[in-house]
């Protein structure tokens, strides 16, 4: 065998090495594959939720990007237009979507365009008007004074001519007659394309300043190329023939009031009004709207020239307009008047004849002088609907500058012609009055930042000022004497006035001067006042102690301070000589103090008298000194001559303590335990050694029992160390002659002990509990007379027959005999002392029912 290992050792080792190598590689591969499979299974089943959460976190982190890397909004193309929509780009060109029928959709939001100046603004066209006219289904809240009730059948179609708005610079006389007089169309055109006063109802404005600022920039861009020179503006104003004004006069009476406030404004006014309508949920009311100073000087010359040309023409129309019947909507809601520039005055005069026919003429878009337009908006008066004198304004009158809620680009009406004439007459004063008006530019910021900026900053108030100012009284609270402020309120109020200008108290609060304060007690100051006003408040201004409001008359209290407590929490009372004769060693209880709402005092030490002038310790505050409800001094030195109450007659007869032949040693235990007969059942007694040591002390106190001091003692719980042991139960072998009497309620001495007269027996708690709960032995029942050894059981009688009558008679006889036997056995139980009880008594014969005798059948 040794040769085999030597010859094949190399091959065996190489085989084992290769086998171990490939085995390890295979095991490793299988382990990796199993681990991957188990991990995949875990992620697909149990760990799927965790994987989703991690993927969500990764998505959120990747999606967050910087706004600076985003594309400029100016690079995006304008949004698509629906049929019938129009849009004005940033360069002023009008983009028309076509003459297709209008689609009743909501207006395009303009909030984002207003906030980003680079974006081309969307111009609200007639497409947005039908949605706004739907508001007329509700009772109109704010309407123009000349606006008639809505007409539902006039809201269906719009002619294509309404959508055509010529460029500024064109004159009204150059319009072709085909556009001025097209084919007859349904009369709803006036409502759809013209009647949009609900759009310009006063709306609270938050971004009104910024919107108007952008509109002014756009209008200025359009105004400069189309305006040219002031001469061109005059030509435009003068281009309207006066014949068009004369045509209005004979036809104004039936219909002019209907269309006075239904003129279609220019796209700029529509844009501004639409922006205000869309932002009504975020706007805030503003009483006056201002404009930048830069527009005042640029338009001053044009305003002056334009108004001078229009004023004589307007004055010619006033007599006819004043004779028109005023049609007002049946409502009491506040109405508004709006004024507009002279260009609108001329155009409305020239367009009035066309409104007589069911035709809408295209509207010229003139350059609007910004200064006059906004100034007249600011000076628009607020008048309720119940005033019929709107058309009776004189040219020389100037309306007060009272703007409705935010200044909106409201629709011009015919009634405002008189307002503009007043402006023309007082142009110089208007320019000078608005020279100081500026517009606060709108600053784009986040909504959270805006909320933080609009928060009302409250000035921090120190705690010292709060404590120094008294709270105000309710207006309905009476100022009776019971509710008058205390001295603390008065002193604090005076100090608060001198230190900080806090809120003044109500005049109805009666402040009384500070009452007298006990200067013997230390002045206490609250922590707030002590920390912050130590340098400001002197010793003479120290705040008095808090108390109940009202006048408090302090009087002397003669109660002494409580005695020092002992180790067991009860005050120690020294021995007193005025005790009862039978229990002279026991100190009597002092009389209780009168009943009061405050905690009562412990028992007063009678051997020490404290004068009524003695105060509490100086270091103790006033609140800790107990005071009785009944104020005044009580003289404890008065001698009371009442004799102690007599003893009950029973205790006098049965108590061995009254026996004159009883020795002193035999009376000691009875005297010691007499006063605590009932208290012994509540607490545990001390060891007997302490009782023995206290006997000589009681012996010395006994001669002083003849003192005639009165005050019958009241029952009081003694400490645990002074309680005696309870009387031990007497066994059956004790003689009946020495049985004690029942202790009376006057705590007479307990019985003497027969074993030892001087020292009571040792009290064992366990033994007493065992004897108390030990039951007497059970009584052994005696044997019956019939079951005794000398007696034989009775022989049952033979049954006569099996008939029912015989059986009944047998049962009756059996019951009678068994009842007699039972009575006899019960009577003999007391005489039989041998044997145990009969356990078969419950199986008596009368208990078992009688059965038929199948064996002894009668033959």
Swiss-Prot record:
Residues 826-835 have a biased composition (Acidic residues). Coiled coil: none annotated. Residues 137-146, 154-179, 209-224, 240-290, 333-358, 372-400, 479-490, 704-714 have a biased composition (Low complexity). Residues 587-602 have a biased composition (Pro residues). It is a peripheral membrane protein. Residues 772-786 have a biased composition (Basic residues). Residues 38-95, 137-290, 320-358, 372-624, 638-859 are annotated as: Disordered. Belongs to the AIM3 family. This is Altered inheritance of mitochondria protein 3. The gene is AIM3.
């Amino acid at each position: 065998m040794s040769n085999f290992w030597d010859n094949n050792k190399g091959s065996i080792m190489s085989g084992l090495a290769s086998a171990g190598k490939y085995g390890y590689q295979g095991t490793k591969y299988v382990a990796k594959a199993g681990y991957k499979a188990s991990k995949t299974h875990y992620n697909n089943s149990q760990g799927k939720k965790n994987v989703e959460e991690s993927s969500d976190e990764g998505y959120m982190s990747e999606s967050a990007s910087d706004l600076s890397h985003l594309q400029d909004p100016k690079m995006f193309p304008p949004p698509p237009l629906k049929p019938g929509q129009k849009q004005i780009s940033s360069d002023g060109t009008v983009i028309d979507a076509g003459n297709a029928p209008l689609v009743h959709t909501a207006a395009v939001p303009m909030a984002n365009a207003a906030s980003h100046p680079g974006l081309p603004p969307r111009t609200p066209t007639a497409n947005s008007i039908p949605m706004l006219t739907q508001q007329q289904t509700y009772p109109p809240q704010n309407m123009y004074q000349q606006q008639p009730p809505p007409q539902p059948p006039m809201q269906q179609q719009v002619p294509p001519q309404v959508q055509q708005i010529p460029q500024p610079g064109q004159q009204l006389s150059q319009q072709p007659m085909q556009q001025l007089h097209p084919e007859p169309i349904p009369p709803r055109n006036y409502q759809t394309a013209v009647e949009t006063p609900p759009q310009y109802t006063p709306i609270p404005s938050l971004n009104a300043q910024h919107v108007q600022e952008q509109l002014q920039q756009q209008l200025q861009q359009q105004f400069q190329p189309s305006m040219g020179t002031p001469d061109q503006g005059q030509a435009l104003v003068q281009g309207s023939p006066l014949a068009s004004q004369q045509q209005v006069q004979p036809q104004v009476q039936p219909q002019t009031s209907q269309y006075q406030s239904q003129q279609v404004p220019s796209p700029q006014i529509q844009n501004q009004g639409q922006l205000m309508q869309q932002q009504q949920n975020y706007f805030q009311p503003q009483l006056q709207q201002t404009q930048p100073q830069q527009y005042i000087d640029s338009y001053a010359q044009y305003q002056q020239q334009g108004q001078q040309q229009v004023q004589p023409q307007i004055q010619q129309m006033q007599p006819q307009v004043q004779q028109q019947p005023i049609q007002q909507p049946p409502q009491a809601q506040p109405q508004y008047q709006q004024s507009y520039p002279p260009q609108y005055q001329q155009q409305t005069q020239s367009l009035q004849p066309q409104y007589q026919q069911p035709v809408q003429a295209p509207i010229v878009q003139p350059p609007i002088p910004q200064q006059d337009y906004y100034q007249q908006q600011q000076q628009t008066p607020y008048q309720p609907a119940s005033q019929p004198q709107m058309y009776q304004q004189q040219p020389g009158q100037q309306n007060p500058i009272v703007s409705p809620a935010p200044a909106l680009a409201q629709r011009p009406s015919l009634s405002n012609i008189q307002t503009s004439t007043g402006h023309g007459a007082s142009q110089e004063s208007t320019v000078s009055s608005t020279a100081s008006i500026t517009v606060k530019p709108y600053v784009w910021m986040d909504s959270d930042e805006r909320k933080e900026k609009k928060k009302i900053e409250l000035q921090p108030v120190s705690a010292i000022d709060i404590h120094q100012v008294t709270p105000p009284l309710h207006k309905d609270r009476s100022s009776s004497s019971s509710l008058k402020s205390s001295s603390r309120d008065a002193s604090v109020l005076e100090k608060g006035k001198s230190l900080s200008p806090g809120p003044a108290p109500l005049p109805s609060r009666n402040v009384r001067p500070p009452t007298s304060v006990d200067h013997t007690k230390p002045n206490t100051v609250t922590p707030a006042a002590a920390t912050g006003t130590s340098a400001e408040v002197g010793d003479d201004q120290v705040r008095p102690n808090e108390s109940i409001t009202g006048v408090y008359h302090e009087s002397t209290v003669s109660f002494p301070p409580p005695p020092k407590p002992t180790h067991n929490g009860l005050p120690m009372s020294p021995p007193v000589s005025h005790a009862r004769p039978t229990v002279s060693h026991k100190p009597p209880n002092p009389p209780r103090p009168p009943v009061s709402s405050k905690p009562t005092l412990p028992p007063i030490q009678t051997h020490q008298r404290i004068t009524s002038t003695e105060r509490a310790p100086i270091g103790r505050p006033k609140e800790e000194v107990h005071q009785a409800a009944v104020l005044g001094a009580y003289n404890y030195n008065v001698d009371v001559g009442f004799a102690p109450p007599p003893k009950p007659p029973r205790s006098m007869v049965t108590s061995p303590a009254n026996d004159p032949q009883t020795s002193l040693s035999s009376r000691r235990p009875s005297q010691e335990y007499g006063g605590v007969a009932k208290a012994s059942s509540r607490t545990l007694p001390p060891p007997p050694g302490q009782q023995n040591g206290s006997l000589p002390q009681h012996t010395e106190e006994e001669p002083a029992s003849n003192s005639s001091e009165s005050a019958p003692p009241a029952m009081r719980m003694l400490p645990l160390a002074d309680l005696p042991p309870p009387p031990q139960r007497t066994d059956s072998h004790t003689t009946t002659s020495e049985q004690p009497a029942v202790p009376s309620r006057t705590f007479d001495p307990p019985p003497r002990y027969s074993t030892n007269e001087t020292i009571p027996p040792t009290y064992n708690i366990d033994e007493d509990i065992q004897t108390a709960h030990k039951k007497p032995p059970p009584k052994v029942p005696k044997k019956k007379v019939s079951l005794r050894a000398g007696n034989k059981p009775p022989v049952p009688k033979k049954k006569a027959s099996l008939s029912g009558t015989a059986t009944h008679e047998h049962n009756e006889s059996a019951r009678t005999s068994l009842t007699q036997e039972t009575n006899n056995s019960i009577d003999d139980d007391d005489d039989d002392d041998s044997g145990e009880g009969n356990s078969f008594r419950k199986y008596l014969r009368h208990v078992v029912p009688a059965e038929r005798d199948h064996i002894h059948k009668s033959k």
